[in-house]
Amino acid sequence: MMSRVLRWTVAVFLASLPPTGLAAEPGLITMPSKYSVEVTIQRFEAAIRAKSDQGWMVFTELDHAAAAEKNGLKLPARTVIFFGNPRGGTPSMQKSPTLAIDVPLKALVWQDDQGKVWLTFNSGAYLQDYVYPRHGLPSNPAAATAFDEFLKQVAEQATE
């Protein structure tokens, strides 16, 4: 249990550091994965699908590296997983249709120039403090905390 708490603390700290020399953006949580890009994606999606009884689902993936290759360009692995919970998102979109531009939620599995694999996603606080208000929706700190706990579990299942 203590190692999970420590790992999460380190992940949040790492979110504040630039993993490839670029400035890290606030609200992003980046965790190292001990697996390949493909396996990390599979494990992340399996962890989301395991919560389907609670409404969670994986919608699709977007492989940026494959798109680059089709256009004669090279890009290290960069796959975005679109996922969400219509039970939570739909009522918010009913109140503010423009929220649909920012949801479903996304997670990025990527490989840096040294071959290290990372999982990056938005924090609950970022979603509640910036995304929701941008669409005229109230912030909900309790929802942000619950979302962070949910994603902590999913991310650990994908990366450990």
Language-model features and meaning:
Residues 1-9:
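Bacterial N-terminal signal peptides that target proteins for export
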Residues 13-16:
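Repetitive helical segments and hydrophobic/amphipathic motifs
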Residues 40, 44, 64, 143, ...:
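Stable alpha-helical elements in mature extracytoplasmic
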Residues 106-137:
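Beta-strand/loop substructures that line and gate deep hydrophobic ligand-binding cavities in soluble
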